[in-house]
Amino acid sequence: MNTPLRVGIVGCGVLANAMAGHLARQPRPVEIVGCLVRDPGRARGALPCHGSWEALLAQRPEVVVECAGQAALAQYAQVILAAGVDLVPASVGALADDALRGALLEAAAAAGARIRIPSGAMVGIDGLAAARHVGVAEVLYRGTMPPVALQRYVSGPLPERGLAFAGSAREAVARFPKNANLTGTIALAGIGFDRTRVEMLIDPDATANVHELLARGEFGDFHARVSGLRISESSPSSRIVAGSLAQAALGSGFLALS
């Protein structure tokens, strides 16, 4: 295709710029039509920035990728979808809010838009979604991260080593809004936010974010594991997350939320 894919972005931080870099290297031409930020004058990087969603949508993006956190997704997702523009959310954990998820699905259906859930930092999301049709009884996500990947983004004390959290995916995204968005993707692909179990561990010796997905049911069972290097010291996201956002923006490798 010679016609550039027009992509908008919510946010202009490390993750957004990494994702834009991947898009720039694709065989199909891609035009970043703009980033939605609070203060365009303070935005990092060379991407064009806009201070309002109206200005961003005026650039006629075909798809918008959210890279700015759960609050930004809650604020802007509905107007983007209502404009008939597909949405790729990085902050999938926000969709644990049943009312928000319902409103976004309603807006998408009315406008003919899609919510494209990226695979994020994990492999095996497609397999989990397929297994759901056969029957899934249990799903466990276990994340092991160095202290810096967690302590900077949560309030309250955390242990120096070992288990920092055990609970449901719904509880995890509330406790770790910057670190547990992957659990939202797993919950949506599988058995939901309340039945998906999550363990978050701290390992001072870890040099990467380790993600494990274990599932069991009538289909059988599987165990997937990814050791993901982080984008930078200033970002909790694994490098593969930026790649998954780029892939979903290009139209493949995503879970269509319904």
UniProtKB/Swiss-Prot annotation:
List, alphabetically, the HAMAP family matched: NadX
Q: What class of enzyme is it?
A: oxidoreductase
Q: In which pathway does it act?
A: Cofactor biosynthesis; NAD(+) biosynthesis; iminoaspartate from L-aspartate (dehydrogenase route): step 1/1
Give the species.
Answer: Bordetella bronchiseptica (strain ATCC BAA-588 / NCTC 13252 / RB50) (Alcaligenes bronchisepticus)
Upper classification of the organism: Bacteria, Pseudomonadati, Pseudomonadota, Betaproteobacteria, Burkholderiales
UniProt-annotated binding residues for NAD(+): 121, 181
Which residues does the Swiss-Prot or TrEMBL record annotate as the active site? 211
Q: Output the Gene Ontology terms for molecular function.
A: aspartate dehydrogenase activity; NAD binding; NADP binding; oxidoreductase activity, acting on the CH-NH2 group of donors, NAD or NADP as acceptor
Q: What does the UniProt record say this protein does? A: Specifically catalyzes the NAD or NADP-dependent dehydrogenation of L-aspartate to iminoaspartate.
Give EC number(s), comma-separated.
1.4.1.21
Query: Example GO biological process term?
Result: NAD biosynthetic process
- A Pfam family per the record: Asp_DH_C
Recorded catalytic activity of this chain's protein: L-aspartate + NADP(+) + H2O = oxaloacetate + NH4(+) + NADPH + H(+); L-aspartate + NAD(+) + H2O = oxaloacetate + NH4(+) + NADH + H(+)
Q: Which UniProt keywords apply?
A: NAD, NADP, Oxidoreductase, Pyridine nucleotide biosynthesis
Q: Which family does it belong to?
A: Belongs to the L-aspartate dehydrogenase family.
Q: What more does the entry say?
A: The iminoaspartate product is unstable in aqueous solution and can decompose to oxaloacetate and ammonia.
What is the gene name? nadX1
Q: Know the name of this protein?
A: L-aspartate dehydrogenase 1
